[in-house]
């Protein structure tokens, strides 16, 4: 793409420069000028005269002039019917058409001494027209199809539910239920001669035997004797203390089960 754009720019510049080419001024005879004794034929052989150029004749007006004549008058050095005559000492002749043109000096004897010039004017060099570029040249700023990404539609975002303090559900507490405090007042019988039953999982349940409350002494079946119960004389246990103990044990059992599960 960059090379094609560069070629286009170069072609346009070349065409413009050719169109703006300045016409060449040919000073007749070179440094010697338009005078007797100058080798005008040799000088003209090394020049190229094209349409648009100019012929410049420099000479002393008191001694020379410039006369344009036809081919027969040029050959005979006789300006019978001159086409145009210049006598100002610095004559400028534009070359507007291709073909041959003939010039001599009209002073007597000067043409025969070599003051004659034949000029062959060639057409201006033409440049072949640049082939038109196809209309399919992409723009430099146009993005390529592969670089255009499809636009994905935005998905609606689900609103995040906001829980109000009134609708919040309390989380289950992992803490163990509080164990009711032990009753500070136990009956004398419980404090002195009774032991509380131990439940599974308690610190004291590691022993293989289960402690039981000693209520009294039963008569031995082997002796067959009848004896009074050992605790007959002891005062009866307080019913409220026993109820508290039962509730305490049941609560402890429930606490241990909740802890295990």
Curated annotation (Swiss-Prot):
Disordered as annotated region, ranges: 194-239
- PROSITE patterns registered for this protein in UniProt: COPPER_BLUE, PHYTOCYANIN
User: What range does the record give for the signal peptide?
Assistant: 1-23
Gene Ontology MF, one: electron transfer activity
Q: Where in the cell is it found?
A: Cell membrane
Q: Cross-referenced SUPFAM superfamilies, in alphabetical order? A: Cupredoxins (SSF49503)
Q: Which CDD domains match?
A: Phytocyanin
UniProt membrane topology term: Lipid-anchor; GPI-anchor
Spell out where lipidation (GPI-anchor amidated alanine) occurs: 237
What are the Phytocyanin domain coordinates in residue numbering? 24-123
Q: How is it modified after translation?
A: Glycosylated.
Give a GO cellular-component term: plasma membrane
Instruction: Summarize where Cu cation binds, as residue positions.
Output: 64, 105, 110, 115
Keywords, ordered alphabetically: Cell membrane, Copper, Disulfide bond, Glycoprotein, GPI-anchor, Lipoprotein, Membrane, Metal-binding, Signal
Q: Name which cysteines form disulfide bonds.
A: 77-111
For this protein, the record's Pfam families field holds:
Cu_bind_like
Propeptide stretches in the record: 238-261
The UniProt entry, under Gene3D superfamilies, shows: Cupredoxins - blue copper proteins
Give the protein's recorded name: Uclacyanin 1
Please report the organism this UniProt entry assigns to the protein: Arabidopsis thaliana (Mouse-ear cress)
